[in-house]
């Protein structure tokens, strides 16, 4: 059975990265008159699409649980990958009277939520993996009193990934890999939240004894659809493997799906991100490339936020930041992890996690 180091705290929420596809659509598992039924109604507006087998899919799974367990109703609006349509899509979603809570995530949605929250003061807004400005100096004219936002200390989990990566490649522990002491990290685009992954990863790589300047290859998908371009992700990963990388870690939403394809072709390895991608990937060969996944468990975070919201204890008008100490981020310890990572190294990673939690190790951040 998978033992997953994942979220707990009621103050947790998360998210990063737009999915694939381009057309806007909506789905609902609630009746159109759900407002009359007395159910609390969540509208999940995605600046992208479901199907990334990572971040947004995790969020959706958590929100679906609220229907069964907490009596919420859920409507999902997928805005697609065309950024020029996101502003109007959020306007349309917020203008409807078919929700009590509008949930959205990533840095790209901050301006939308900041504008809409004061316009709809009787509604609640959840923003994950980014935070609005609560001072009133910019953004929300009402100081975002009806907005709850949460950021994650992804740098702490990335530190563990970097530590593990260096130890694996230095020991030449991954079967069939060249053992050149190199790894790759593919980000979606160079923004603070992605840079936080990079900074943490390099710090962990260095702490394990590696040289991040020569041992960590970093590249960004970029373009018009940085978090929804699997073809570009495959191209970048293939180039990294050709440069001698034993493994590549995609931090780029569904662009990362191309990395798993490339890993199979190159007979190399990967780390997953945001969800347990050993579990969510459907291709058996791709699954075997996933040594571990570094988690921001959006689904559990949203579920816990919904639980607190229903109880009247969710703190609006402020933001929270959660990391390893709060079980806000973590890593997957499953059968594939046990198979590919020697027991002594598994113990070292656990020890490093404990040091970060206790404050004995302070991980640098891009923020």
Task: Go through each PLM region and give its residues.
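A residue-level marker of the well-folded mature domains of exported/periplasmic proteins
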Residues: 30-367
